[in-house]
Amino acid sequence: MRQSACINTLIRRRDNASEPKITDSISPKEASPTLLSRLGFLVALGFLRLTSVLPLRLLHWIGGGLGWLFAVIPNRSAATTRRNIAACFPALSSAEQESLARQSLKGMVCTGLEMGKAWILPIEGTLAQVTEVEGLAALQAVAKAGEGVILLAPHLGNWEIFGYFACEGIASNFMYQPPKNPQMDALLRGVRAKSGIQLAPTNRKGVAILLGALQKGELVGVLPDQVPNDEGGVYADFFGESAFTMTLISRLAQRGTPRVFYGFAQRLPKGKGFKVIVH
C-alpha cells in the first residue's frame, strides 16, 4: 500500500501556531525516567518483540481490522486523513475519497505493526523483509563511485526498512530527532548502530555534519515530508494550501554536485514482504 503516513498528519498551515524550536542537542533533556515512562517503554518493547516474530501476513490482517476501527471511530488521525485527501484529490467522489482514507489508515496501522521487524530483528532479518528491488543499482553505483548522494525517504510504505536496505554497505548519515522517552531513544540509537548509519542532530551542527558527509562523497538521508523548525522552512503552495516546507534539501543540493534520489519500501500483498523502489 503506497499511501503516505504523512497524509494522516496535519499540514502546518499559516494559521497554525508556531512549532517548537529545535534544540541544540541530539539527546533528550537529562532526566531520570519516571515510573510511568518506564512502564510505557516496557509495554512498547514487549509489543515490538511480539510483532517482530509474527508473520507479516498476520500483522497486515490485524492492521486491516485496526485500520477499519480507526476509520469508523471518531479520532484525530481519521479526521486529518479525510481533510488532506479532500484537499489533494477534490476530483474524486465522496465514496472514492473515503475508500482512499480507509486504505491510508490501514497502511498507517500496518506500519506501526511492522516496526518490530525493523527495530528488534537482527539486521539480516530486517533486510530479509525486502523481496523485490527496483532502481537501487543506480544509487549504489553513484555511492560506490564516491559521489555525494542525497536520498529522500518520505513517510511512504515502511521508511525504516527502506532506509536500512537502501543504505546497506554505503557510508550513510541521517538526521535524527530523539523521542522524549530516554529508554526508547537508547533503543533506537542501538538500532541505527547495528546498520552502521551515522546520526546527525536536527540543528545547525547537524546540517554541517551532512554537508561534510556530502563533501566526502557519502550518502545523506532526509525525510522530506517532516515539518521543519521555524528557521528551516518557507511557506509554499501545496494543493491549494500554504504549507510550511523544509528548505534543507535545496540547501544541501546547492552545495557541490550531489546526486538526488528518492525511494520507498512498497508493502506487497499477502505478507510477501516489501519492494524497494528507488528513482
Task: Name the predicted role of every residue range.
Residues 11-153, 185-187, 194-196:
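Membrane-anchoring hydrophobic helices of lipid-metabolizing enzymes
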Residues 111, 116-279:
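Soluble catalytic domains of membrane acyltransferases
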